[in-house]
Amino acid sequence: MIYLDSAATSLLKPPSVVRATAMAMRTMASPGRGGHSAAMRAADTVFTCREAAAELFHVPEPERVVFTMNATHALNIAIHSLVSPGDPVVISGYEHNSVTRPLHALGAQVRVAESSLFEPEAAVSAFRRALPGAKAAVCTMVSNVFGYLLPVREIAELCAAAGVPLIVDASQAAGCVAFDAAALGAAFVAMPGHKGLLGPQGTGILLCFAQPKPLLCGGTGSQSVLQDMPEELPDRLEAGTHNVPGIAGLLAGIRYLSAQGVENIERRERRLAQRLTAQLRTEPRLEAFASLDPACQTAVLSVRCRDMDSELLAQKLAHYGVAVRAGLHCAP
């Protein structure tokens, strides 16, 4: 199989990720739920992964790294921490349903900072116009449909100047685009473990630079006499048993990325995307949605066939062993 669907889930994991996940299932119990060696081994792995993620994203305190089920879970925590029913919230025009559906469910007044594709200056201007009076803002770092790298740093500066807390969706950026999460100045940064971080499905991370509200309540293995969730991170948000095998695999994925260098991965992926785009544009039947400015384009690439439905094209490619995704990509 030629696997070209890593924007949904990375399939070809490093062997170290598979080994670490399997080893955790054989040798690790639950962190904070016992003093025996299997529980202590699990606790050490979870903490080490927290430290590794903090180092990768330049987070000064590892406890600000909260493990979640996926990016959707992380975004829901962030949104429910900042948004109340009726609040005006600014979003970009490229957000995933993991942003738009929670906002709709909360009854937020959503303002879309609309801007043309691959025009970062227009995106900044759109946010500048939409921010006054907003209670929160959400912006994806990279569009999961077009691979468009939005000017999140500039948008974050606008939000800070306006006193509007920002949530950054780094689902398509984490592990593929080098960035300093702490320097962004965002309230929260959400990401999955199973895409660019090369971890197993069922893993995610929320980087917390503001005080969050728990989305789930339950056992934390700490401060059990309290009726409410602990105030301290990460326990405040990590109710219930951790996905220890997933976190062990995620740790191996992060270590692989750190050894390779995210900057090197980013350069290689962009070169490959540019080569593919150039080749696709030699075929008159195909339309490739990619920026001419490599600074705006990541390795996520959308293509349309002018005389064939995209679903049918994906089926034909699957017949030849090429895995792609067609449709709205959860971002209509």
Tell where the protein language model's regions lie, with residue ranges.
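Pyridoxal 5′-phosphate
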Residues: 1-332
